[in-house]
Amino acid sequence: MAESMVGLKRSHRCTEVSSADIGKKVTVMGWVAKRRNLGALIFVDLRDRSGILQILFDENIIGKEGFDKAYTLRNEFVIAVEGEVIKRSGAVNENLKTGDIEIAAKTLRILSESETPPFPIEENIQTKEDIRLKYRCLDLRRPDIQSNIIMRSKVATLTRAFLANEGFLEIETPMLTKSTPEGA
C-alpha cells in the first residue's frame, strides 16, 4: 500500500551522494532498479534520473517491520529511504559513480507500488518500438532516452537564452507550427 510523502524532503539525488557524505543522514527517492535478498541483508539499487545508488536493508538497523517491508519491494516500486551514508563493506562497484558507498536504511516508505513492467528499464535492451510507445512513461525512464531528453532541454534552454539576450521575443502561435490531427 502506498504511503504518504507528508514530511518527506529529498536531500540528495542518487549520484549526488558521495564518500564525502559518509556518516551523514540523507533522504533519497526513486525507483527500485534491482533487489537482491541475501537472507539477513537486502540490497536495492535505487534509480532516479541522475543514476543508481545502492541501499542496504539490515534488520538490525531498520528493525523487523522495516525489513519486512523491504522484503516486499519489487522492480519499479517508488520508494523514499532515510539512512546513513556508509562505505561499502563488500566489493566496490567501479561501474557506478556511487560504487564505493551505500545507504544503510533507517526508514523506508513505499510511495507507489508497481506491477511487473512489460520490458526492462535498462540501457541496451532491445524492445519493439510499438511496445515502447505504448508504455512511453516507462520508456522515458531508460537512461539512453533520458540523456537524449536532457540534451534536448539544454539546447532549447541555451537557444532561448541566446535569442532573449539578442532582444528577440518568443511568440507562440499555432500558425507557425503544424497542427496535429485528432488533437494528438
Region locations from a protein language model:
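Class II aminoacyl-tRNA synthetase catalytic cores and aaRS-like
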Residues: 1-184
